[in-house]
UniProtKB/Swiss-Prot annotation:
It is found in: Cytoplasm. GO terms for molecular function: urocanate hydratase activity. It is an enzyme of class 4 (lyase). The gene is hutU. The active site is at C410. It comes from the Bacteria. This is Urocanate hydratase. Belongs to the urocanase family. It catalyses: 4-imidazolone-5-propanoate = trans-urocanate + H2O. Catalyzes the conversion of urocanate to 4-imidazolone-5-propionate. Its cofactor is NAD(+).
């Protein structure tokens, strides 16, 4: 019997102001853990899988139940330790210490590979936490929409003089992360053709309004794209097909998209990528009997897809890696020039990171969408001279369906995060918001990750693989008084390729919370500015000076 599988479970986080725990500082992590497994949020909630292949919220259902039980009895001077999804200890700390400290999927570097991890996973000794799955701050596909939108807007500016009308994006993957591409692309003015092998995922994205149409053949999908482009109105199409097949077929036909990328779960060749010619049922069976054969076949198909991406790049498509490590997988099986197309961070996002700008997110623990709309208005009030940000908030309200507890993603940086958070805390204090909010972020942020094939690819000083930075980030957030802090390995790009940290803090309207919020939401993005200034980026150095950061070696 698999202790991780229970189809009878249907987890819905409590709404409103009635507490199940002893305070909001423990109620918040409980609700957010539960929200990660909401049926409209998680990819496979019955298996505790939130997103990203096998990214889980808890190691098994016994561990989940025990975490909930402990959070409900935890005092405000105690801290729960969670080791790879398993609650292993409660210790006396103090009121400003985190209520939960989490470490997921971390392995000594020599053993930091999928083979060793999978053995531990089968023995029930480890859990893959991805980024926000095991750190309890996943908010559904919205969590990556704005970052993807910002990337596609940058693509239009760099390659098409800012004009996306009549142009289209080819991509793969409509899972928890990839599902953002279709909505983000159309919001940026592109049509999008997204290949997906799992029809239930396409249907889920249709239901939550992230995909406009479904196609079952390439000809049908291309006709939909052509019709939309002729009409000047972007459309997103989920095509039920294997990305490797489709990408290669387009090369064969001489059909060149304007933009090419991919967000399949290529980071996990065993569980995340379906080999060409295989059905999902065949792959599921083979994973139980021949793991090495599945990995070999998956990587061979990735090589086909990456070669097609290179060919489409040669034909004129703006081609980018979207952080799933597919280039590395193809390189390992013989595609020697797999890295000839860039990753999205060095190509489009790094200037934002240099100012500590990244995926700031907040969640209304009340469950009331009005609380989010009120915070949207507060953001506009406090940042009045940013029409791009205002446009994003307007589009988000109009086009993004909430999944689980209402939430918002909003890319802001060092100069704005703390003051927005303090304003939210004040709104809770004076009753403008009906309950506390939690504020967190993706681990994909400016100072919280080391990932040489993604966030820290091609750093100016060559420090791509130095992982001291996310460790320092986690330590500083703990010292600053975050409500929960996490330190993970392998998120986004797979085992051996990344280390990263997460942070969440509760705005409960108290003066004590205001002090913690002011520290955490300043220090956290400041570590990103510090990291990039240390690497030699002038934008970061200037930001550090403007914001008065004390960086001894920058004097």
């Amino acid at each position: 019997m698999d202790k991780r599988h229970d189809p009878s479970r249907r987890i819905i986080a409590p709404h409103g102001t009635r507490l199940s725990c002893k305070s909001w500082l423990t109620e918040a992590p409980m609700r957010m853990l539960m929200n990660n497994l909401h049926p409209d949020v998680a990819e496979r909630p019955e298996d505790l899988v939130v997103y990203g292949g096998i990214g889980r919220a808890a190691r098994d259902w016994d561990c989940y139940d025990k975490i909930i039980e402990v959070l409900q009895r935890l005092e405000d001077d105690e801290t729960l330790l969670v080791q790879s999804g398993k609650p292993v200890g409660v210790f006396r700390t103090h009121a400003d210490a985190p209520r939960v400290l989490i470490a997921n999927s971390n392995l000594v570097p020599h053993w930091a590979n999928w083979e060793h991890f999978n053995e531990l996973d089968k023995l029930g000794l480890a859990m893959y936490g991805q980024m926000t799955a095991g750190s309890w701050i996943y908010i559904g596909t919205q969590g990556i929409v704005q970052g993807t939108y910002e990337t596609f807007v940058s693509v239009a500016k760099q390659h098409f003089e800012g004009i996306s009308k009549g142009k289209w994006i080819l991509t793969g993957g409509l899972g928890g992360m990839g599902g953002a591409q279709t909505l983000a692309g159309t919001m940026a003015g592109f049509s999008v053709l997204a290949c997906e092998v799992d029809e239930t995922r396409i249907d889920f994205r249709l239901r939550t309004r992230y995909v406009d149409k479904k196609a079952t053949s390439l000809d049908e999908a291309l006709a939909m794209i052509e019709e939309a482009n002729q009409a000047g109105k972007p459309v997103s199409v989920g095509l039920l097909a294997n990305a490797a097949d489709v990408f290669a077929e387009l090369v064969k036909r001489g059909v060149t998209p304007d933009v090419v990328t991919d967000q399949t779960s290529a980071h996990d060749p065993l569980n995340g990528y379906l080999p060409q010619g295989w059905t999902m049922a065949e792959a599921a069976a083979m994973r139980k009997t021949d793991e090495a054969g599945v990995v070999k076949a998956a990587k061979a198909s990735m090589a086909v897809q990456v070669q097609a991406m290179l060919d489409l790049q040669t034909a004129g498509a703006a081609t980018l890696d979207y952080g799933n490590n597919i280039r590395q997988m193809a390189f390992e099986v013989g595609v020697e020039n797999a890295f000839d197309f860039p990753g999205f961070v060095p190509a489009y996002i790094r200037p934002l990171f240099c100012e500590g700008i990244g995926p700031f997110r907040w969640v209304a623990l009340s469950g009331d969408p009005e609380d989010i709309y009120k915070t949207d208005a507060k953001v506009k009030e406090l940042i009045p001279d940013n029409p791009h940000l205002h446009n994003w908030l307007d589009m988000a309200r109009e086009r993004i369906a909430f999944q689980g507890l209402p939430a918002r993603i909003c890319w802001v940086g060092l100069k704005d995060r703390a003051r927005l958070a303090l304003a939210f805390n004040e709104m809770v204090k004076n009753g403008e918001l009906s309950a506390p909010v939690v504020i967190g972020r993706d681990h994909l942020d400016s100072g919280s990750v080391a990932s040489p094939n993604r966030e820290t690819e091609s750093m100016l000083d060559g420090s791509d693989a130095v992982s001291d930075w996310p460790l320092l980030n986690a330590l500083l957030n703990t010292a600053s008084g975050a409500t929960w802090v996490s330190l993970h390995h392998g998120g986004g790009v797979g085992m051996g390729f990344s280390q990263h940290s997460g942070v969440v803090i509760v705005c409960d309207g108290t003066d004590a919370a205001a002090k913690r919020v002011g520290r955490v939401l300043w220090n956290d993005p400041a570590t990103g500015v510090m990291r990039h200034a240390d690497a030699g980026y002038e934008i970061a150095k200037n930001c550090a000076k403007e914001q008065g950061l004390d960086l001894p070696m920058q004097e």
